[in-house]
Amino acid sequence: MNPWRRYSWEIALAALLIFEILAFGLINPRLLDINVLLFSTSDFICIGIVALPLTMVIVSGGMDISFGSTIGLCAITLGVLFQLGMPLPLAIIITLLLGAICGLINAGLIIYTGVNPLVITLGTMYLFGGSALLLSGMAGATGYEGIGGFPTAFTDFANISFLGIPMPLIFFLVCCLFFWLLMHRTHMGRNVFLIGQSARVAQYSAIPVNRTLYTVYAMTGCASAIAAVLLVSYFGSARSDLGASFLMPTITAVVLGGANIYGGSGSIMGSALAALLVGFLQQGLQMAGVPNQISSALSGALLIVVVVGRSVSLHRHQILEWYSRRRNAHQA
């Protein structure tokens, strides 16, 4: 296949991203400053870190809407463990394991109950979110303050740069490379696509369906934990609400990136570009003085437009055939 046609959607997203940055740059010239442009990504890049493994979940025919609560649970757990005197490196490792366990719980419930993944992860979203609030209350970390007092070396980590590139953005780029290789260059990635197209056929073809699903959900949970650690480092405090605003932008990024919500198709590169597109949209509107409520409404509208547009694109032949029949009937 012609590379231009194969990556036409990704190329369109890249062009739209450049246009978006230039458009917001005309409104607020500060956004065109390379340092402002790079360091502003730290405010939203965790959306992209979670969107990458979530792409694999959606391509497999699944769904996970509990990652925001997982971020909050992992963040407050990190704070509580540190507050109890645990060495920070060990607390971070346990936090990452907790994120993976949250993903495994999702996968286990989905596989062994056969209930729609959206319903299961809706339940675990409240389970993890409630657990985070309970843990926060027990630790006396209610409100916006959370748990602070982290070492300067840790709080500086998400605010420093390497070769002029912010550390969270470097994490995102590394994750992009890892998940792109995993999704598009390995047997596991091929299995994810086949499961999304037909889980039953994949099972009859001796593809390890359950193991693959456990892996992609665990990676989403682990990515949520990584996002939690970066957010705690960035803000300097551990709070149970750190992932509260992640749901809509992250799912919008995955769908806008080209993932079919019914499974079977998707692109890591597309999700990465779409995450930047959604992030800079929010950032640009904020710098232009637009209220957060309007920014959220625009993100929701963008998601609806993309879903409807892709649905029309997928069924364009049936639509054209129906239109042709109607026109012929009128002419007759």
UniProtKB/Swiss-Prot annotation:
Major place of residence: membrane
Coiled coil feature spans: none
GO cellular component: plasma membrane
InterPro entries: ABC_transp_permease (IPR001851)
Membrane topology per record: Multi-pass membrane protein
One Pfam assignment: BPD_transp_2
Keywords: Cell inner membrane, Cell membrane, Membrane, Transmembrane, Transmembrane helix, Transport
Membrane-spanning ranges: 7-27, 45-65, 70-90, 91-111, 118-138, 162-182, 216-236, 240-260, 261-281, 288-308
Single Gene Ontology MF annotation: transmembrane transporter activity
Localization terms from the record: Cell inner membrane
Family: Belongs to the binding-protein-dependent transport system permease family. AraH/RbsC subfamily.
PANTHER family per the UniProt record, alphabetical: ABC TRANSPORTER PERMEASE PROTEIN YPHD-RELATED-RELATED, AUTOINDUCER 2 IMPORT SYSTEM PERMEASE PROTEIN LSRD
The protein's role, per its UniProt record: Part of the ABC transporter complex LsrABCD involved in autoinducer 2 (AI-2) import. Probably responsible for the translocation of the substrate across the membrane.
Record's subunit section: The complex is composed of two ATP-binding proteins (LsrA), two transmembrane proteins (LsrC and LsrD) and a solute-binding protein (LsrB).
Name of the protein described by the UniProt record: Autoinducer 2 import system permease protein LsrD
Gene for this chain: lsrD
